[in-house]
Amino acid sequence: MAAMTPLDLTCHPASPAPVPLGVRVGLERSGSLLTLLWRVQADPASIVWPAPQPAGPADGLWQHTCFEAFIRRDDGSPSYTEFNFSPSGQWACYRFAAERERDSAPAAAQPHAPVLRFQPLIDGAQLVAQLTLPDPPDDDHPGWRIGLTAVVETAGGPLCWWALHHPAPRPDFHHPGGHVLRLPADRPLRSF
């Protein structure tokens, strides 16, 4: 299994964190199963963590602390899938035919429900999400390009927008220039 260092997300300069804060992501892929681990390092009291809710799909998760993955085929196609994972246990999945253009085709049905596990820590928290990739690998699969992001709500403060790469002057996780991580289809990968 190939190894990588966990990936540090950076806060967008237009939304600086008002408290000391760091966000890292690790990932592991085996077949069509992708496991993502977000680790927030901060004084736990300085972050607003959504209260537990029944597990299931929900909209508007990005309005509070949540973790996101944008996944597209690495073949130049404009279509992609957005996943949102909340510490509350709720999640969302949206498919797009192009940037911010929702896909209404029958094939855009919801995937299998992801499995989420949120764990408060003495110096922050972590969230693990296990999901089935929206486009399973086959012999001719080009692999994926992924944007890994986080929205962090600070206590008494604004939202901070974190990503592997910010290609625009304002936070925009849908921008294809932010989907910079290449995930090969021909071999497993582990970065935590």
What are these regions (language model features)?
Residues 1-53, 60, 165-192:
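Order/disorder boundary and secretion-linked terminal/linker segments
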Residues 3, 58-78, 140-192:
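Acidic/polar low-complexity flexible segments
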Residues 12, 23-27, 111-122:
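Beta-strand-rich interaction surfaces with strong enrichment in secreted/lumenal proteins
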Residues 22, 33, 64-68, 80, ...:
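Extracellular structured ligand-interaction cores
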Residues 27-29, 40-44, 73, 133-135, ...:
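Beta-strand elements of well-folded, non-transmembrane domains
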Residues 56-117:
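Extracellular/luminal beta-rich ligand-recognition
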Residues 123-137:
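Localized edge beta-strand/strand-to-loop motifs within extracellular or lumenal beta-rich domains
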